[in-house]
Curated annotation (Swiss-Prot):
The chain crosses the membrane at residues 18-38. Residues 1-17 are cytoplasmic. SUPFAM superfamilies: S-adenosyl-L-methionine-dependent methyltransferases. Residues 55-258, 271-291 are annotated as: Disordered. GO terms for molecular function: methyltransferase activity. It is an enzyme of class 2 (transferase). Glycans are attached at residues 215, 247, 264, 270, 302, 579, 595, 756. GO terms for biological process: methylation. The lineage of its organism: Eukaryota, Viridiplantae, Streptophyta, Embryophyta, Tracheophyta. Belongs to the methyltransferase superfamily. Residues 85-143, 151-160, 168-177, 187-231, 280-291 have a biased composition (Basic and acidic residues). Its EC number is 2.1.1.-. It is found in: Golgi apparatus membrane. This is Probable methyltransferase PMT26.
Length: 829
């Protein structure tokens, strides 16, 4: 009888069958462990990520590390900002989230997430779920229908993985040197985040793609196929040249045309600046030694003005040392020797601003918590405190019962004004809360409103919060920062400016900026009241205006508002000037350039009207809107434009370029909810093409022409837009949190040659509203430098892209404020 064999007892060698069984069991166990590890590495950390939402942006390091250290485990510290869906903003009735988590918790989470980064999936543009990094196709299909908690966790995980991966950040800032397939080149990374906070990324490193293939399980073939299609469709310029056209991106991603446009416009931008190639080359050489520093620490400004601090208008030390304030010198700009590099605090309880047009009627009190103006001007219907709102029931002293009636009354008095046709660009001096300019939008007219920062507390700040263009400025000792002969109409409604004194120096400044044939609309008390002081002012003004050859067109009284309006017209020829009995005011010297206005003292003289029919000002511009698209008649083909072409051709090419960029890229490709954008600034406008391309949106654009750039501001006005001269080495004359979007096209690389770039970015932060957008187009080195600075402020990088030493950066400002404080002694009073 055969005996059973017991290996342990008999101490005999096990059979080969038993050995095979054990091997299979061990192998299966290892496979299961491996699958479990892969699954946990992709999903597990998402539970921790929830702790690092918008509510805890304080929990992020303040110091940026230089690129050389990134490969050694150091990383850019950036909060995964999950902004509320902008489509649901409405009146902005929800406060912006608070920040209250510690930095130690954030650091621990970042260390864990960094270990898992390499196993992250490369997103596809074919389905939204794959783009968000899901691993299970069944779960992905749920995500397409709205998703749930798992979707948010995976999305937050991807946000952090992209930002924490040192290799990814290095690639993000490297320019591509060859125009090859993106998957082969491995030098570019494009990041995108839609307005609901969902970030997508396109990693063009082929090695990463190969690693992903090895690690993926159930959806390997699908991911690989869609990744390849995404790369070929959305990135490589050669695809467009070969005639391929695919529409595989999801609703949140920009369509293929927009992504291709991001490349095309960058290439076009390089070519368009060929006339400045030498200057750019010298600048880039000078930048090499300064572009590597990425240690940025921010502090909070401690000033008397607090959340309303304007550096060049709140220089208490300089104002106290003024020898005189007779000419409103204390209301003029007095910039500190070293511009501040600290950040302005937010007012307590700051909320997302109410959207236009509701903002014209009411704003949040907590955003502009000032009541003195309501108390001082409440009886004149300027502004009232209504619960948690500040409301604007009438508009101004001269139109208590509404601005629109007043606006229509002016045109009824002088039909030639023709709002929105002949008259398009208006200057409103002493604007108050700018209701006049705010309601002129209804007549297709844009208004540059100005008022000083004076005892009428925060009047310009009210205007900007309402979504109405305005600047802090005063008629003092220097010229206004505008070219000569650009405004169609100048308006003054009880603006309290002593026009008639000192030879009419202030009124002569209006004469400088007013077009020949333009109107001066004056509705101050001397026009219709008979008090002794008013009668004397009216007499002096009448004599001065007659000597200036202005024609009194109309004097009418509005019975509803109870005010009178006098309208004058500037002459279009020099005949009257030549026939005056005495040359007072005198004619300006031929050497006096009427367009020179940056810190130029006022002169009590008049500039003659242009007699040459080819000169600007000799003819009235085309009626609006034809003037927007047509090159001004005085641009000659013999003139060389900014970009090297004949001036009219340069103008047209610039307009076509920006229409293409805005339509194909900015409107759809950057994840911006334009319904929430109202106040826009082009920090380096050339011909105003960017602003012109935004014409159909409910926005207005402040076109800034830097003082060291070609003087093209008159062209901007000629096409029915407006703007201002400015030196970006100084602060802008506006209140903090004034703009929803800033656009900087090849500005910062030029500025850092003569300015402190850190101070410039601090000014950008001051001017931009929380959740506001910054779009930067510049060389790749400058893009990297700016990105490092804004990341140190915990801003959210929506997209960054670089190719052939040119880059594009789109970021969103956060509500983060530093805990460290810097006291500005010159601003303490």
């Amino acid at each position: 009888m055969a005996q059973p064999r017991y290996t342990r007892i008999d101490n005999r060698r096990p059979s080969s069958n038993y050995c095979s069984t054990v091997t299979v069991v061990v192998f299966v166990a290892l496979c299961l462990v491996g699958i479990w590890m892969m699954t946990s590495s992709s999903v597990g950390p998402a539970q921790n990520v929830d702790e690092v939402s918008l509510d805890n942006k304080d929990g992020i390091k303040k110091q940026m590390t230089p690129p050389a250290e990134e490969g050694n485990g150091q990383k850019f510290e950036d909060a995964p900002v999950e902004t509320p869906n902008e489509d649901k903003k409405g009146d902005g009735d929800a406060s912006l989230p608070k920040e209250d988590e510690s930095s130690s918790k954030q650091d621990n989470q970042e260390e864990k997430k960094e270990e898992k980064t390499k196993e992250e999936f490369t997103p596809s543009s074919e389905t939204k779920s794959e783009t968000e990094g899901g691993e299970d196709q069944k779960d992905d299909s749920k995500s397409e229908n709205g998703g749930g908690g798992d979707l948010d966790e995976k999305k937050d995980l991807k946000d952090n993985s992209d930002e924490e991966n040192p290799d990814t950040n290095e690639k993000q800032t490297k320019p591509e040197t060859e125009d090859n397939e993106l998957g082969e080149d491995g030098e570019n990374q494009k990041q995108f985040e839609s307005d609901n906070g969902e970030k997508k990324s396109i990693d063009d490193d082929k090695k990463s793609s190969d690693d992903d293939k090895e690690n993926k399980t159930g959806n390997e073939d699908t991911e690989t196929k869609t990744e390849k299609e995404n790369t070929e469709t959305n990135v490589d310029v050669q695809v467009e040249q070969e005639g391929q056209s695919k529409n595989e991106t999801s609703g949140d991603l920009s369509p293929p045309g927009a992504q291709l446009e991001l490349l095309n416009e960058t290439t076009a931008q390089n070519g368009s600046f060929s006339t400045q190639a030498t200057e750019s080359k010298n600048e880039k050489e000078a930048q090499k030694g300064s572009g590597d520093k990425l240690d940025y620490k921010w502090a909070l400004c401690n000033t008397t003005a607090g959340p309303d601090y304007i550096p060049c208008l709140d220089n208490v030390q300089a104002i106290r040392s003024l020898p005189s304030t007779k000419h409103y010198e204390h209301r003029e700009r007095h910039c500190p020797d070293s511009p501040p590099t600290c950040l302005v605090p937010l007012p307590d309880g700051y909320k997302r601003p109410i959207e236009w047009p509701k903002s014209r009627e009411k704003i949040w009190y907590t955003n502009v918590p000032h009541t003195k103006l309501a108390e001082y001007k409440g009886h004149q219907n300027w502004v009232k405190v209504t619960g948690e709102y500040l409301t604007f029931p009438g508009g101004g002293t001269q139109f208590k019962h509404g601005a629109l009636h007043y606006i229509d009354f002016i045109q009824e008095s002088v039909p030639a004004i023709a709002w929105g046709k002949r008259s398009r660009v208006v200057l409103d001096v002493g604007c108050g809360v700018a209701s006049f300019g705010g309601f002129l939008f209804d007549r297709d007219v844009i208004t540059m409103s100005l008022a000083p920062k004076d005892e009428h507390e925060a009047q310009v700040q009210f205007a900007l919060e309402r979504g109405i263009p305005a600047i802090s400025a005063v008629m003092g000792t220097t010229r206004l920062p505008f070219p000569g002969r650009v405004f169609d109409i100048v308006h003054c409604a009880r603006c309290r400016v002593p026009w008639h004194i000192e030879g009419g120096k202030l009124l002569l400044e209006l004469n400088r900026v007013l077009r020949p044939g333009g109107f001066f609309v004056w509705s101050a008390t001397p026009v219709y009241q008979k008090k002794t002081e008013d009668v004397e002012i009216w007499k002096a003004m009448s004599e001065l205006i007659k000597k200036m050859c202005w024609e009194l067109v109309s004097i009418n009284k509005d019975t509803i508002n109870g005010v009178g309006v006098a309208t004058y017209r500037k002459p279009t020829s020099n005949e009257c000037y030549k026939n005056r009995s005495e040359p007072v005011p005198p004619i300006c010297a031929d050497s006096d350039d009427p367009n020179a206005s940056w810190k130029v003292p006022l002169q009590a003289c008049m500039h003659t009207a242009p007699e040459d029919k080819t000169q600007r000002g000799s003819q009235w511009p085309e009626q609006w809107p034809a003037r927007l698209e047509k090159a001004p008649f005085w641009l000659s083909s013999s003139q060389t434009g900014v970009y090297g072409k004949a001036a009219p051709e340069d103008f047209s090419a610039d307009y076509e370029h920006w229409k293409r960029v805005v339509t194909k890229s900015y409107l759809n490709g950057l994840g911006i909810n334009w319904a929430s954008v109202r106040n826009v600034m082009d920090m380096r406008a050339v011909y105003g093409g960017f602003a012109a391309a935004l014409r159909d949106l409910k926005v207005w654009v402040m076109n800034v022409v830097p003082i060291d750039s070609p003087d093209t501001l008159a062209i901007i006005y000629e096409r029915g837009l407006f703007g201002i001269y400015h030196d970006w080495c100084e602060s802008f004359s506006t209140y903090p949190r004034s703009y929803d979007l800033l656009h900087a096209d090849h500005l910062f690389s030029k500025l850092k040659q003569r300015c402190n770039l850190t101070a410039v970015i601090a000014e950008v932060d001051r001017v931009l509203r929380p959740e506001g957008k910054l779009i930067v187009r510049d060389d790749a080195e400058t893009i990297q430098q700016v990105e490092g600075m804004v990341k140190a402020m915990k801003w959210e990088v929506r997209m960054t892209y670089s190719k052939e030493k040119e880059g594009l950066l789109s970021v969103q400002k956060s509500i983060w404020r530093p805990s460290e404080v810097e006291t500005l002694t010159y601003a303490i009073g």
